[in-house]
């Protein structure tokens, strides 16, 4: 399971011109699910994301987590995080989990976050989305539950 975690001032997702999810200060998470992912990957990434100390304290040090600041989170499914561009010019998405299986793991991930964070928004799984991200910093972290980064 892969995630691009961005510290944001605000973020929103639109589908067909209508806002389906929006947040204020917190994290925008683009989430990719692979064929090898299990509930253990969900647990690992959830704990890592909500406890990442990427928010500044009173001394401007990155010492606070999403939970510490009471921040929001928006989670957007993005299978293209498993695009393999090593051969040719067209990405291969063979490692990405598709369809119903990915939808189930995505929802389990979202539900696990909702147990820890008050304001959780999402995109629409499988939809063509417009994602608006107002970065803060910017601070962007790449995470992989298989630790390949």
UniProtKB/Swiss-Prot annotation:
SUPFAM superfamilies assigned: DTD-like
Enzyme class: hydrolase
Keyword terms, alphabetized: Cytoplasm, Hydrolase, RNA-binding, tRNA-binding
The encoding gene: dtd
An annotated GO cellular component: cytoplasm
Coiled coil: none
Protein name: D-aminoacyl-tRNA deacylase
Species whose genome carries this gene: Clostridium botulinum (strain Hall / ATCC 3502 / NCTC 13319 / Type A)
Domain of life per record: Bacteria
NCBIfam families in alphabetical order: D-aminoacyl-tRNA deacylase (TIGR00256)
Pfam families linked to this entry: Tyr_Deacylase (PF02580)
PANTHER family in UniProt: D-AMINOACYL-TRNA DEACYLASE 1 (PTHR10472:SF5), D-TYROSYL-TRNA TYR DEACYLASE (PTHR10472)
């Amino acid at each position: 399971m892969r995630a691009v975690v961005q510290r944001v001032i605000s973020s929103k997702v639109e589908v067909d011109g209508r806002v389906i999810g929006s947040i204020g200060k917190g994290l925008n998470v683009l989430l990719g699910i692979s064929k090898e992912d299990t509930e253990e990957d969900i647990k690992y990434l959830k704990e890592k994301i909500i406890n990442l100390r990427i928010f500044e304290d009173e001394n401007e040090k990155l010492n606070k987590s999403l939970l510490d600041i009471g921040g929001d989170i928006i989670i957007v499914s993005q299978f293209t995080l498993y695009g393999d561009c090593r051969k040719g010019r067209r990405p291969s998405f063979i490692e990405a989990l598709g369809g119903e299986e990915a939808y189930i793991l995505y929802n389990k991930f979202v539900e696990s976050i909702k147990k820890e964070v008050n304001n959780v928004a999402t995109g629409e799984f499988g939809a063509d989305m417009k994602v608006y991200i107002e970065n803060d910093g910017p601070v962007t972290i790449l995470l992989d539950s298989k630790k390949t980064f």
